[in-house]
Regions:
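C-terminal membrane-associated helical module and adjoining short loops/tails
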Residues: 1-9, 14-17, 135, 153-156, ...
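Alpha-helical transmembrane segments of integral membrane proteins
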Residues: 5, 14, 18, 22, ...
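Intramembrane alpha-helical segments
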Residues: 5-9, 80-170
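Membrane-embedded alpha-helical segments that form the functional core of polytopic membrane enzymes
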Residues: 20-68, 104-107, 117-131, 176-201
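Residue-level recognition of pore/gate-forming positions within transmembrane alpha-helices
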Residues: 23-24, 54, 100, 127-130, ...
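Short helix-capping/hinge motifs at transmembrane helix termini and TM-loop junctions
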Residues: 30, 34, 110-115, 137-138, ...
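Hydrophobic alpha-helical transmembrane segments
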Residues: 38-49, 65-72, 89-98, 125-137, ...
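Multi-pass membrane catalytic core of lipid/isoprenoid biosynthesis enzymes
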Residues: 51-52, 70-123, 214-251
């Protein structure tokens, strides 16, 4: 039982649940609502396979990250270490390869190879990026943050591209597909930007261990104040877009959506912005990271409104 609990902590079970919830809400509140009268046969089974493929690849990524981060984690979070303390490194690397392989196989089973081969290649690339992120990108300026943010957005984009033809994805006269495209990139864009914000905050939180092992993260290279400015700019951009979006949907009388978004998404972002300036200690940045994660959650939950309004 102790090993099972350790394994679930190693693969970040709450994060995997959040990822699955994102894809499930996207499927049932957006895709199914838009295409309710024309959902192709077998769509649900393909979707389920893709969800598990995403979860396995993400779990493998968390494992390989811990595998290569043992020295840094001994400084930043010694009480939370799993690999080499509760689970042997050999078992960790074995689980990484098994889960990565399972994720790629499930992707291939979920999609017709002739039409969707590029998505199988994309998920193979995700596995490779997670490995390179853990060994190189994570310790470099901005690159690691961008990679993780792109992979976060990909959890939504992979579902979108599995359902539409690549040639028609970015330009079509079909009203439903245009609506599907816009909502996909709205949420993928939100996921990308909020991840950029959180990764930069986590870099400030992890400075003690990162600096000891010569990582070139943003706060180490540019300084904490410059990193705060970077985070603040993205926060302002995201809040501005969300405010404009609320004004836009008011013309359709989406009162409940606006009443939810302002206190549950926009206000917490403003709180992060205000707290950011005075944050100095590791605990301060940890608190900001936690609030940012909460905003990711409340943002994804807003998909529920499209089930009622579309």
């Amino acid at each position: 039982m102790r090993l099972i609990a350790a394994f679930l902590r190693m693969v970040r079970l709450p994060n995997l649940f959040f990822m699955a919830l994102t894809q499930v809400l996207f499927q049932f509140c957006i895709f199914n609502t838009i295409y309710k009268n024309s959902i192709p046969s077998g769509d649900l089974s393909r979707f389920v396979l893709l969800v598990f493929a995403s979860l396995f690849i993400a779990a493998a990524g968390y494992i390989i990250n811990d595998y290569f981060d043992i020295d840094i984690d001994e400084v930043n979070k010694p009480d939370k270490m799993i690999v080499d303390k509760l689970i042997h490194r050999r078992w960790a690397i074995a689980w990484h390869f098994m889960l990565s392989g399972a994720g790629i196989i499930l992707t291939a089973l979920a999609l017709p190879f002739a039409q969707k081969w590029y998505l199988i290649v994309a998920n193979i690339l995700c596995v490779a990026l997670l490995w390179i992120y853990s060994t190189n990108f994570k310790k470099s300026l901005l690159t690691g943050n961008i990679v993780i943010s792109l992979l976060t957005a990909w959890t939504i984009l992979v579902i979108f591209f599995s359902k539409v033809e690549l040639a028609d994805a970015f330009g079509t006269e079909n009203i439903n597909q245009t609506k599907f495209f816009r909502l996909t990139f709205l949420y993928a864009g939100f996921a990308f930007i909020i991840s950029l914000i959180r990764e930069a905050i986590k870099d400030m939180e992890d400075m003690p261990g990162d600096s000891k092992y010569n990582c070139k993260t943003m706060p180490i290279v540019w300084g904490v104040n410059a990193t705060k400015v970077y985070v603040a700019v993205w926060l302002v951009v995201l809040m501005a877009v969300l405010v404009i979006l609320q004004v836009y949907v008011l013309q359709f009388k989406w009162w409940l959506a606006v009443a939810y978004s302002i206190p549950a998404i926009i206000l917490p972002l403003l709180i992060i912005l205000l707290k950011l300036r005075k944050s100095i200690r590791t605990q301060d940045f940890h608190q900001l990271s936690t609030i940012t994660k909460l905003v990711m959650f409340t943002g994804i939950l807003s998909m529920f409104f499209f089930y009622y309004y579309l």
